[in-house]
Design a protein with these regions (language model features):
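C-terminal segment of classical bacterial N-terminal signal peptides
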Residues: 15-25
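Beta-alpha junction/loop-to-helix N-cap segments that form part of ligand/metal-binding clefts
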Residues: 32-34, 47-54, 66-140, 149, ...
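Signal peptide-proximal N-terminal region
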Residues: 54-76, 169-172, 201-204
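Venus flytrap/periplasmic-binding-protein-like
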Residues: 81, 127-129, 133-138, 215, ...
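Extracellular/periplasmic Venus flytrap/periplasmic-binding protein
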Residues: 86-90, 135-136, 144-254, 292-299
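Periplasmic-binding protein-like
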Residues: 95-108, 126-130, 178-183, 209, ...
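Extracellular/periplasmic periplasmic-binding protein-like sensory domains
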Residues: 250-330, 411, 425
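Segments of small-molecule ligand-sensing domains
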Residues: 310-323, 334-409
């Protein structure tokens, strides 16, 4: 009898200990803010996808090195999409419920963004598409869960035309000019078309649309047409190997690189480094940042991570264009959580729904950005229920044969053109999906 009681007591004690251990583990897990990381480190777009992923992951590591988000440490898990929409959706489904639930997804693909836009509201997980994705999702009154922070492709297209206007000596000088858009034949590439058509109608220039099939290595027919028509300017809405191919074709055709403008996914080191001096004069838009090797945040990453063997990827790529894009995209994800903690509790893990409120109420002032190490890199970003973009500043940088350098002042996209376009497209989406615009009460939730 005594033996039985001792065994029973021991069993209860072990059960209690196990319960305590499970509770401790669960508590430890819930004290981490989970960020799924969709990447493409393999495939045709890997040369551009890898540096972005390295910058993104390094910033998450840096946050932990700084002590977390008000003490809450960050956890993350990568999932390889290969830039394929179906694989991106698979990654979303696999990671959305992990480690207490996903905070936010950043698809790094307009195609994946379109697919997840349909899923995120039901799962109550926000999407950040910093400088890409659906341009009309800047309208937060319709797209409650989408945040194209810092700009959209319509902002990019508008600012490129503004720089061309300056180059030709005024808007009136655009009349009769010919601009050719060479674009990746995908949702990403097609995003440029509406704003350029709008500007063409305003200024009276001819717009030619020249699609290029994935992945973009076959452009012979495109450049035969450009050689024949000799447009005044060529816009490159490319990604991955399409960009270097385009510049090589331009070189072979004798088309002046000074008259070519790339979207910001076509204006990084992998796009030009193999061509070097042959790409000199090529322009690309930057949604605020460029290569920022001298920035405070880069110095901190090198000191706190790479100097200790904890960095992600090659040390000499830290601060390059796409690395910086990953870095600042991760920063947006973190700062939305920090903002949410102001409402829902400092030092607490935020749900995706709570984080969404943070992204909708971002107020990244210049002093805040400077304190985070982004002085001279980013301008203030402030979102609201109606405005999920938060800023519309951009610059042009130009390849000088060995590095990118800024060649323009700051531009702001023309809201008189873009806002009506955004509203019309958002209204069309709402009608198709049978959605109502958000009420003031919903905006406060």
């Amino acid at each position: 009898m005594k033996l039985r009681q001792l065994v029973l007591a021991a069993t209860v004690a072990v059960a209690g200990l196990s319960s305590a251990l499970v509770s401790t583990v669960a508590t430890a897990q819930t004290k981490e803010q989970f960020f799924p990381v969709l990447v493409y480190r393999t495939g045709a777009y890997a040369p551009n996808g890898v540096p972005f992923a390295n910058g993104y992951v390094d910033y998450l590591k840096l946050v932990n090195a700084r002590g977390g988000i008000n003490g809450v440490k960050v956890s993350f898990e990568e999932c390889e999409t290969g830039y394929a929409t179906d694989r991106g959706v698979e990654c979303y489904e696999r990671l959305k419920g992990k480690n207490g639930g996903a905070t936010v997804f950043q698809p790094l693909s307009t195609g994946i963004t379109f697919a997840l836009t349909e899923k995120a509201p039901g799962d109550k997980i926000p999407l950040i598409t910093a400088g890409y994705g659906r341009s009309e999702s800047a309208d937060g009154n319709v797209f409650k869960w989408n945040f194209p922070l810092a700009g959209t492709y319509w902002v990019a297209g508008d600012v490129i035309i503004q720089d061309i206007v300056k180059k030709v000596g005024g808007a009136d000088k655009l009349k009769g000019k010919h601009i050719a858009l060479v674009y990746h034949d995908s949702p990403f590439g097609k995003e440029a078309i509406p704003i350029l058509q709008e500007r063409a109608a305003m200024h009276g220039f001819k717009l030619s649309l020249l699609p290029v099939t994935h992945p973009g290595v076959e452009q012979k027919s495109t450049w035969l047409q450009i050689r024949r028509d000799r447009p005044d300017f060529v816009l490159n809405w490319g990604w991955g190997v399409m960009n270097s191919t385009l510049l090589k074709e331009a070189q072979a055709t004798g088309y002046p690189r000074e008259q070519i403008y790339g979207v910001w996914w076509a204006g990084a080191e992998p796009d030009v480094k193999d061509i070097g001096a042959g790409a000199k004069g090529y322009n690309a838009i930057t949604m605020q940042h460029g290569a920022e090797k001298g920035s405070a945040v880069v110095k901190e990453v090198l000191e706190k991570l790479h100097a200790k063997g904890q960095g992600t990827g090659p040390k000499d790529e830290v601060g390059e264009v796409l690395y910086m894009r990953g870095l600042f995209s991760a920063m947006f994800g973190i700062e939305g959580v920090r903002q949410a903690q102001e409402k829902y509790g400092k030092g607490k893990v935020m749900t995706g729904e709570q984080a969404r409120w943070g992204y909708e109420n971002l107020n990244l002032t210049q002093p805040k950005l400077d304190a985070l190490g982004f002085k001279g890199v980013l301008r203030p970003i402030s979102t609201s229920c109606a405005d999920h973009m938060g800023a519309n500043w951009a610059r042009i940088h130009t390849w000088n044969g060995s590095k990118w350098e800024f060649t323009s002042d700051w531009y702001q996209a023309d809201d008189q053109i873009i806002k009506p376009m955004v509203k019309a497209a958002a209204d069309k989406y709402a009608a198709e999906k049978k959605l109502n615009r958000r009420t003031p009460a919903d905006c406060q939730s």
